[in-house]
Curated annotation (Swiss-Prot):
This is Falcipain-1. Its main location: membrane. PANTHER family: CYSTEINE PROTEASE FAMILY C1-RELATED. Cysteine protease. In the mosquito midgut, required for parasite development. Pfam families: Inhibitor_I29, Peptidase_C1. The gene is FP1. GO terms for cellular component: membrane; merozoite dense granule. It comes from Plasmodium falciparum (isolate 3D7). Residues 97-118 are annotated as: Disordered. PROSITE patterns: THIOL_PROTEASE_ASN, THIOL_PROTEASE_CYS, THIOL_PROTEASE_HIS. Its EC number is 3.4.22.-. It comes from the Eukaryota.
């Protein structure tokens, strides 16, 4: 009986088959529902993702199209600067227009009197038509300026295209005004001879006055200034500093333009570069005077060039008792030497805002001498001598001699083991380097030994006097002005010559037929040095400069030859 009772209780306790199936069915329905919901969520997420991709793609495409269609597309900070410009020059422009109208009224009165008394009326009618065109341009300029100011004050993204269109119209009007003013250009004559210097100075002063006061030109130069800022990654603290830099840039830009246009005797051209927003005072601050090297240090650690190579045949032939004789050195050495063509000169590097030119000149010299000796060009560390050479002042200046002295006493790391930062580091990290190069001594060269030293040793570290004329160099043979003080170090990598009529401006390595030039009188030949700078490949002729010299290379132009050293491996 008990067993039967337990079996009944067990039977009642077990769930029926129907209940089990119902539970399973409910579970499956929940699972299907969850799967469906997840699928819906996934589908919605996919749709949102696709919409986002399309949106950003279209936005990017539209932005690129706008940039392609209009290279003068304005940004908010550009609009802000233009607003300040317009406000600043508003009164000046009104004054110019009033003066212009008064002058035109006086001229009209004079012309009317002349017309009444003069039989030749054709020229007067022509002058009246020119003035009426100029008045029309000025009135149109006023209207456009007012419209431009209206859009600038709104300062939103939607007006960018319209702002840019107006800017283009303003620039076109400005060109028309300048074209009309060419009819009134002056010719500067002294004793019936064209005075180029006078024309350059007077023309420069007149154009500077006009450009400085005319708001249309300031808008045009603002556009060029924005392009300059973008190309050279210029960032200023605030609008006041930006305006100050803009004024400096504008003056430098006009100076560059006038040099290229008016200075016909110059053998070189200028261009805008990373220094175009530097004032003369700022350049002096950046290019500090190089450290002085006392004579006792030179005597203690360096070897005179003639003593270093005293057994050399050329030394004995062209130097008597340590002094240069009168023999023509070019009877034994080539008239053109360019170590770039021999593959032992690295491409110019960029020292940045750090005053480390001395490090780049000396380390570049070690690289070239090492490559000349070992047939293998390596890159060594400028940053190491900036951080570790205690005789130098890091980014605050130095001298190639002290850089060589450091390597003589400590060796030098490879560049990839001690990378350049363009700033001083508190610690010297040369202990991390595995491979180093060492020097045995330092060579010293006199100004009348440069040609021979280049041929026998290789590239040389030299110092020059840099000013605002020098830094704006673009191409050609530089024969401009230089600073009296030596404030910059470069690497002398060769020399050359070219017939004046064949001097051309380009950024490629130039070679010339020396046999042709040898038949030319000296007055018809331009002699030059080839120097490697440390202001990047964008400066000068792919980072290099051709600098004027005399035939024997001993005229010390721009200071080349005063302090010359080289590493002895």
């Amino acid at each position: 009986m008990v067993a039967i009772k337990e079996m009944k209780e067990f039977a009642f306790a077990r769930p029926s088959l129907v209940e089990t199936l119902n539970k399973k069915k409910k579970f499956l329905k929940k699972k299907e529902k969850r799967t469906f919901v997840l699928s819906i969520y996934a589908f919605i997420t996919f749709i949102i993702f696709c919409i986002g991709i399309l949106y950003f793609t279209n936005k990017s495409s539209a932005h690129n199209n706008n940039n392609n269609k209009n290279e003068h597309s304005l940004k908010k900070e550009e609009i802000e600067l233009l607003r300040v410009l317009l406000e600043k020059y508003k009164k000046q422009k009104d004054g110019i227009l009033n003066e212009s109208s008064n002058e035109e009224d006086e001229e009209k009165y004079t012309l009317n009197s002349e017309t009444y008394n003069n039989k030749n009326n054709v020229s007067n009618i022509k002058n009246d038509s020119i003035k009426s065109k100029k008045e029309e341009y000025i009135n149109l300029e006023r209207i456009l300026l007012e419209k431009y100011k209206k859009f600038i004050n709104e300062n939103n993204e939607e007006n960018r295209k319209e702002l840019s269109n107006i800017l283009h119209k303003l620039l076109e009007i400005n060109k028309l005004i300048l074209r009309e003013e060419k009819d009134d250009k002056k010719v500067y004559l002294i004793n019936d001879n064209y005075d180029e210097k006078g024309a350059l100075e007077i023309g420069m002063n007149e154009e500077m006055k006009y450009k400085k006061e005319d708001p249309i030109n300031n808008i045009k130069y603002a556009s060029k200034f924005f392009k300059f800022m973008k190309e050279h990654n210029k960032v200023y603290k605030n609008i006041d500093e930006q305006m100050r830099k803009f004024e400096i840039f504008k003056i430098n830009y006009i100076s560059i333009k006038n040099h290229n246009k008016l200075n016909k005797n110059a053998m070189y051209k200028k261009k805008v570069n990373q220094f175009s927003d530097y004032s003369e005072e700022e350049l002096k601050e950046y290019f500090k005077t190089l450290l002085h090297v006392p004579n006792h240090m030179i005597e203690k650690y360096s070897k005179p060039f003639e003593n270093h190579l005293k057994d050399n045949i050329l030394i004995s032939e062209f130097y008597t008792n340590g002094k240069r004789n009168e023999k023509d050195i070019f009877s034994k050495v080539p008239e053109i030497l360019d170590y770039r063509e021999k593959g032992i000169v690295h491409e110019p590097k960029d020292q940045g805002l750090c005053g480390s030119c001395w490090a780049f000149a000396s380390v570049g010299n070690i690289e070239s001498v090492f490559a000349k000796k070992n047939k293998n060009i390596l890159s060594f560390s400028e940053q190491e001598v900036v951080d570790c050479s205690k005789d130098n002042f890091g980014c605050d200046g130095g001298h190639p001699f002290y850089s060589f002295l450091y390597v003589l006493q400590n060796e030098l790391c490879l560049g990839d083991e001690y990378k350049y930062k363009a700033k001083d580091d508190m610690f010297c990290l040369n202990y991390r380097c595995k491979r180093k190069v060492s020097l045995s001594s330092i060579g010293a060269v006199k100004e009348n030994q440069l040609i021979l030293a280049l041929n026998e040793v290789g590239p040389l570290s030299v110092n020059v006097g840099v000013n605002n004329d020098f830094v704006a160099y673009s191409e050609g043979v530089y024969n401009g002005t230089c600073s009296e003080e030596l404030n910059h170090s470069v690497l002398l990598v060769g020399y050359g010559q070219v017939e004046k009529t064949k001097l051309n401006y380009n950024n490629k390595i130039q070679t010339y037929n020396t046999k042709e030039n040898s038949n030319q009188p000296d007055d018809n030949i331009i002699y030059y040095w080839i120097i490697k700078n440390s202001w990047s490949k964008k400066w000068g002729e792919n980072g290099f400069m051709r600098l004027s010299r005399n035939k024997n290379g001993d005229n010390v132009f721009c200071g080349i030859g005063e302090e010359v050293f080289y590493p002895i491996l």
